[in-house]
Swiss-Prot record:
Cofactor: binding details: Binds 1 Zn(2+) ion.
Residue interval(s) of motif Thioredoxin WCTKC motif: 131-135
Function as written in the Swiss-Prot or TrEMBL entry: May participate in a redox cascade for the formation of disulfide bonds in viral proteins.
Protein name from the UniProt record: Protein A151R
UniProt-recorded Gene Ontology molecular function terms: metal ion binding
Source organism, top-level taxon: Viruses
Lineage: Viruses, Varidnaviria, Bamfordvirae, Nucleocytoviricota, Pokkesviricetes
Quaternary structure, from the entry: Monomer. Homodimer. Interacts with protein B119L. Interacts with membrane protein E248R.
Keywords, comma-separated and alphabetical: Early protein, Metal-binding, Zinc
Keyword Mitochondrion part of the UniProt annotation: no
Amino acid sequence: MMALLHKEKLIECIENEVLSGGTVLLLVKNIVVSEISYIDNSYKYFTFNANHDLKSKEDLKGATSNNIAKMIYNWIIKNPQNNKIWSGEPRTQIYFENDLYHTNYNHECIKDFWDVSTSVGPCIFNDRSIWCTKCTSFYPFTNIMSPNIFQ
């Protein structure tokens, strides 16, 4: 029961970032592999190769911020812990493992250093976590990584 409540809280936090940020970047080994952006009144989903060449573009017609948040949540759960999410315009709102990311207009990721991360919020944590800007709290993903998470 607690895992389910925690999952719902995480989805709520991610949805808040989707609504307030406008762009979400999904990173694997610090390389952007996907982007979800709100453009022209709908969500667009882009995928990229390692050189950041566009592989595909999809219009997510009819998708809501909650649908997008659930999609991002599922991506987090299914991917290794060294993957990261960037959200913002152009400030970082979600970050993992003390790594904080901004992007320039070419969507090249620029790693920021300690002085920047300390200005965003608490930056020392061991578990992969989401920092929710709405309720200004950390929500660790480790609470929901157990095999019986979906029971």
